Amino acid sequence: MQTSRFLATILGIFALTLCSYAGTLVTLPISPKVGEKIQLEYTAFDADKAMLERSPLHAVLYAFTSQAELPLAVEVELEKRSGRWTGAVTLPNDAVYAIVKVGNGLIYDTNKELFWEILLHNEKGQPREGANMKAAMARYGQLPAPCRMKDDFTEALEFLNKETRFYPNNIVAQFNYIMISKSTGDLTEDEAKGKYREL
């Protein structure tokens, strides 16, 4: 029994060590439009040696539409060039937002559970309707385990605020803003009810 606990502790520490480091991922263009090819360039840190031992690496992009509750996973094989891993992808036409992780199928770099994110833009250069809202929802900490981002309600409120500034008629974003503000204590129960009635 003690041996099992000891092994579990060691494995837990090892897992935490793997998760405490993150490489860097650059996505270009910075503000991609619908149908535009997105270039990925990943640089691993020395601490990612265990992940690199089982190459080749691939990127998994979880693409969100404004309507669907769950994302679509898109896998991209990465090719090693001059110490960097590169690849390219075109996201589905109805995608508004995506988060990315890089790995070998067993071990993934999730950027310390923050992932890397891509907001799709329209022809005017603005985030597509729903992009900031999906970025906010990703921070609720309620996505399926393979793409669960660390929760951050302060950042979620910032993204919801951006969404309602760009798209003041997005009722779902307004509803979520009130709901999160109430759960963080920024709004009282009565204040939240009053704002719900205004929608």
Where would I find each of the regions flagged by the language model?
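Positively charged n-region of N-terminal signal peptides that target proteins for export
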Residues: 1-6
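Bacterial N-terminal signal peptides
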Residues: 8-18
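Glycan-association/targeting regions that enable binding to alpha-glucans and other polysaccharides
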Residues: 21-199
